[in-house]
A protein has these predicted regions:
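Acidic, glycine- and Ser/Thr-rich low-complexity intrinsically disordered tracts
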Residues: 147, 151-249
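Short, catalytically relevant binding-site loops at active-site mouths
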Residues: 54, 75-78, 122-123, 138, ...
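Right-handed parallel beta-helix
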Residues: 8-23, 31-45, 53-67, 81-96, ...
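Short, recurring structural edge motifs at helix starts
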Residues: 1, 47, 73-78, 113-115, ...
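Loop/turn-rich, solvent-exposed surfaces of beta-rich toroidal or solenoidal domains
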Residues: 114, 120-121
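Short glycine/acidic-rich loop motifs that flank beta-strands on beta-rich extracellular proteins
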Residues: 1-5, 21-29, 44-51, 66-73, ...
Length: 249
């Protein structure tokens, strides 16, 4: 795959990657990175943003992976935060490949059927994506409290705060939930998973998240989420200059 670490002001564009037992595109401990117009399929993770800041993931096709697009904090790394990521205008479809990651790796815990997953990431905007056919769930936002290693890293905040979900087209998600999601849905007297799921930690310390058009989605766990106001300019938007390749952010 493509695995930049400790990068600054980078661009990953126009690649086709498949059959990788980790992430096809991995952005680790980096700042101001654009991931644009790539195709990733038949991998464990399509695109993974780990412990990175000011990242734009735009115009990609993530299909037939275990998980399509991930924004993570992994414990024990020199950079302890992951914030200000924009995930927009991507096609995230049919990410139902059985997980074939190396046992013990963090991505080995990704449920098959995951569209977009945010774990412990802050200030993540998920907007204007088409998210369809992901059997466990379209968007899952969770706390690292559910992962022992994240919860035990005292320098990492395990909570996903200030997540914004705006104006995504979502349908045909949650048809065959995997693992714990299936048990959760059964506890709610349902066999179908959600378009959007937010797991709160036991301490309920997650703060400041919002969603637009919530009535359009099948969702669970968004009771504490606010309705989003009009969008604001984010730091990652300021990275582009007028010379960027034919796009205006």
């Amino acid at each position: 795959g493509i695995l930049p670490e400790f990068g600054h002001n980078g661009l990953i564009e126009n690649n086709i990657l498949s059959e990788i037992e980790d992430a096809a595109i991995y952005v680790g401990m980096s700042d101001y990175i654009d991931v644009r117009n790539n195709q990733v399929f038949d991998n464990v993770a399509g695109i993974e943003v780990e412990n990175s800041r000011h990242v734009l993931v735009e115009g990609n096709v993530a299909r037939n992976n275990t998980g399509g697009i991930l924004v993570f904090i992994t414990p024990g790394l020199p950079i302890k935060s992951s914030y200000d990521a924009i995930v927009r205008r991507n096609f995230v479809t049919n990410n139902n490949t059985p997980n074939f990651a190396i046992p013990g790796s963090l991505v080995a815990g990704i449920p098959s059927g995951t569209g977009i997953l945010v774990m412990s990431g802050d200030k993540v905007v998920i907007e204007d994506n088409i998210i369809t056919g992901n059997n466990t769930g379209g968007i899952i936002v969770t706390s690292g409290d559910f992962v022992t290693e994240v919860a035990s890293d005292k320098d990492s905040d395990p909570h996903s705060d200030q997540v914004e979900i705006r104006n995504n087209v979502m349908f045909d998600n949650g048809n065959d939930p995997d693992g714990e999601m299936k048990l959760l849905m059964l506890s709610k007297l349902s066999t179908k998973g959600p378009d959007i799921l937010a797991y709160q930690s036991a301490t309920k310390k997650e703060r400041g998240s919002c969603i637009s058009r919530r009535e359009a989605y099948r969702s669970y766990g968004l009771e504490e989420w606010e309705d989003c106001d009009a969008p604001t300019v984010r730091a990652a938007d300021a990275v582009a200059s007028a010379s960027d390749i034919g796009t205006t952010r």
